[in-house]
Amino acid sequence: MCCVSWNWVLACTFLLIFLSWWNCCNDRISVNSGVPGMAARVAGAHHVVLTEQDELLRLLRVNLAANAEVLTHEIEEEKGGIVARPLSWGIEHTKEYLARYGDEKIDVILSCDCIYEPLYGTSWKGLAQTMELLCLANPKSVVLLAVERRNEDGIDKFLAFVEKETMLLYRRDEVTVGSSKNRLEVYHLHLENILKN
């Protein structure tokens, strides 16, 4: 799902947390939004996969092409780089994705401002299911979820769903206030059997 442009305060907070995780992983990242994934690549992530719904994939690829110069590292190791792939949220779509790309390991899953019921409805259920399936396929992976709190945003419903309906655990890592005076939060999600940091 295409996510709205997100506040730069959130972006900076999110990237600082991401960079601390990046230092302790193997740099294989899956992202459902172009900007955070491109920022991760510029920050040095080795292999980044940007995912989007089929109908928005062309725009994502145009953005990648427009930013190719800054996204390409001088020395590319085997299977490094940044690519865009189709992925819609939900069990069926995620299973199809994993059937095709399941050999690629994921260390970090980034999700930025993808939960907002007035715009996306209850698609957060499919998002939670997708996160769980990606983590089950990559048991040591973590999800970094950045959200902006707004009226009736659905974030509390998402977190309750994650807690009751998935094998994921979550904790809130960061809270700050954005330029629109909304609370910006970053959550860390992982499978139950992974040690908490």
Swiss-Prot record:
Q: What is this protein called?
A: Secreted RxLR effector protein 48
Q: Where in the cell is it found?
A: Secreted; Host nucleus; Host cytoplasm
Give the UniProt keywords, A-Z. Host cytoplasm, Host nucleus, Secreted, Signal, Virulence
Say yes or no: keyword Secreted present: yes
- Per UniProt, the short sequence motif RxLR-dEER occupies residue numbers 58-79
Q: What is known of its domains?
A: The RxLR-dEER motif acts to carry the protein into the host cell cytoplasm through binding to cell surface phosphatidylinositol-3-phosphate.
Instruction: List the taxonomic lineage.
Output: Eukaryota, Sar, Stramenopiles, Oomycota, Peronosporales
Keyword ATP-binding in annotation = no
InterPro entries, A to Z: Methyltransf_16, SAM-dependent_MTases_sf
Family to which this protein belongs: Belongs to the RxLR effector family.
Which Pfam families does the annotation name? Methyltransf_16
* Function, in words: Secreted effector that completely suppresses the host cell death induced by cell death-inducing proteins.
Gene Ontology cellular-component annotations? extracellular region; host cell cytoplasm; host cell nucleus
Domain of life here? Answer: Eukaryota
The positions making up the signal sequence are: 1-27
